Amino acid sequence: MLARRIIPCLDVRDGKVVKGVQFRNHEIIGDIVPLAKQYAEAGADELVFYDITASSDGRVVDKSWVSRIAEVIDIPFCVAGGIKSENDAKEILMMGADKISINSPALRDPDLITRLADVFGQQCIVVGVDSFYNKETDEYQVYQFTGDEKRTQQTGWNTFDWIEKVVSLGAGEIVLNCMNQDGVRQGYDIEQLKQARAKCSVPLIASGGAGTIEHFSDVYQQADVDGALAASVFHKGIIPIKDLKIYLKEQNIEVRPC
């Protein structure tokens, strides 16, 4: 059994780390590089950086901070935001990122996934899926441009159909962002993640909902995800990563030591 990953998520806007609730009302958390260093030293297994307005602004992720992060941390990190070509991806990877993640650009151009995987290898191509549960239709639906509340829009894709599609195109990992749970700290959407796990043959990362230390053990044991991404509980010091890993070990969940 591979060790389960603990992944702090840093949403970036205008050069600062921010955090919202259900992708809205973002507050400033702090500067990117010191936070990245802090999490690496605390025992995080990986970091994810989302330039949350890049796609909706029609630009590529602000690259000015990527190389600075690579200089101060020694754990893998993934960068996302408006990456829509092989050249965009190459620049970010050359600056020191270990993975790149695409979301809205993949919805516009699904074959981008295959082109990136062919050039850089499947292992470093992550596809983010922003999924919203519609209670009226009882469906999980894919959304795009979620970093900008004025431009956020539903796509025509069912969440699980889209996951199957991107895996078939060469995605090496899926991050499932459960929008209903984002920032509210009520637990991961276990039911949605279980359904996604059944459709996903590559590593699956849960995102959205972590509020207590037990939420992490629940998502690993019940949904069989490979990693859990969280923001608020780490940014606000609610759950120290060291304590989380000790607890998971006690629950017989394999994690890397801090």
Curated annotation (Swiss-Prot):
One of its GO terms (cellular component) is cytoplasm. The keyword tRNA processing does not apply. Belongs to the HisA/HisF family. Heterodimer of HisH and HisF. It catalyses: 5-[(5-phospho-1-deoxy-D-ribulos-1-ylimino)methylamino]-1-(5-phospho-beta-D-ribosyl)imidazole-4-carboxamide + L-glutamine = D-erythro-1-(imidazol-4-yl)glycerol 3-phosphate + 5-amino-1-(5-phospho-beta-D-ribosyl)imidazole-4-carboxamide + L-glutamate + H(+). Its EC number is 4.3.2.10. InterPro entries: Aldolase_TIM, His_biosynth, HisF, IGPS_HisA/HisF, RibuloseP-bd_barrel. Pathway: Amino-acid biosynthesis; L-histidine biosynthesis; L-histidine from 5-phospho-alpha-D-ribose 1-diphosphate: step 5/9. The keyword Lyase applies. GO terms for molecular function: imidazoleglycerol-phosphate synthase activity; lyase activity. GO terms for biological process: L-histidine biosynthetic process. This is Imidazole glycerol phosphate synthase subunit HisF. Its main location: cytoplasm. Keywords: Amino-acid biosynthesis, Cytoplasm, Histidine biosynthesis, Lyase. SUPFAM superfamilies: Ribulose-phoshate binding barrel (SSF51366). It is an enzyme of class 4 (lyase). The active site is at 11, 130. IGPS catalyzes the conversion of PRFAR and glutamine to IGP, AICAR and glutamate. The HisF subunit catalyzes the cyclization activity that produces IGP and AICAR from PRFAR using the ammonia provided by the HisH subunit. Pfam families: His_biosynth. It is found in: Cytoplasm.
